[in-house]
């Protein structure tokens, strides 16, 4: 099922507040900024490799994963969507 950038952020924000058992998002938030940052860097390299070697379908998947980890970082640091939108 697809969702918008805003819907994903809302879902992740709810998970950060309700902390459902077994949630990968909660686990990532608990690991902290350093671990989240490492995931962002890892996913960025996977976006690049997908663009060069794996085609647009794989590229879209990797971009989605990058967006997920960026939003987790936003939530961890207390940034809202509006905090980011004002810089677009």
Swiss-Prot record:
Top-level EC class: hydrolase
Nucleotide-binding listed as a keyword: yes
Entry keyword annotation includes Secreted: no
GO cellular component, one term: cytoplasm
Enzyme Commission designation: 3.6.1.31
Family, per entry: Belongs to the PRA-PH family.
Name this protein carries in UniProt: Phosphoribosyl-ATP pyrophosphatase
Organism: Cutibacterium acnes (strain DSM 16379 / KPA171202)
